[in-house]
Amino acid sequence: IAFAREYLCEPMDDMSSLFPSIVLQAAKDSDLRIINRAEGDPDDQYFVGWDPAISSDRSADYTVMVVLRRPSTNPELLELVHVVRRKNMDFRTQIMEIQKLNAKFAPDVIELEANNFQRVFATELRADTDLPIKTFISTRQRRESLLMGLVMRFEREQLRLPWGDENSRTLMSELERELLMFGMSKKGKLDSIGRHDDFAIALALAHWGTTEFRERVVDLDDLMLGLIE
């Protein structure tokens, strides 16, 4: 069944998918579009999710970087505003690309999936730059928490996908295909039956980054309160 769905491009039905099409449809915002740098309210916050890949194989994963914006006027809302999605990006090219994103959006957190070789990115960037790198080490339990957090955000209608121009719609259609492929197996394992899940994982990482930032702010507030007392 998984083979048929993947190669015939047949997504899971809405009863099976973690991200039903009706939920994704509600997230599409025709007034929102992909932007190339931070714009609008300077008090808006930005968060980056980065799922790196290194391989010259044509069937290899994509490197994906997703930028989410948290509007200062509505901090419960998140808006997807920028995407980098490419194959065959070598180590140095990815380092340069994430530095460009940092310069354009000044994110509060860059959440990097850091399993195996991917940890080298964090090591180099922490040594040579002041980028706000946070690493996500993926175990089965943490990956499920990562995805379920994104599911809840969609279900609460607190995440907006850009649908305002052709470029945005093309990118979001690819994201939608990946999200529809996520479900729960008969063995109780939460996973994707798709060939690629990099876009969806990068989005989930960016969302995770927003929660890490909030936890850090709370910790700082608690610390200041303790000092005052």
Where are the regions that the model predicts?
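RNase H-like, metal-dependent nuclease domains and their acidic two-metal-ion catalytic environment used
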Residues: 1-137, 144, 148, 152, ...
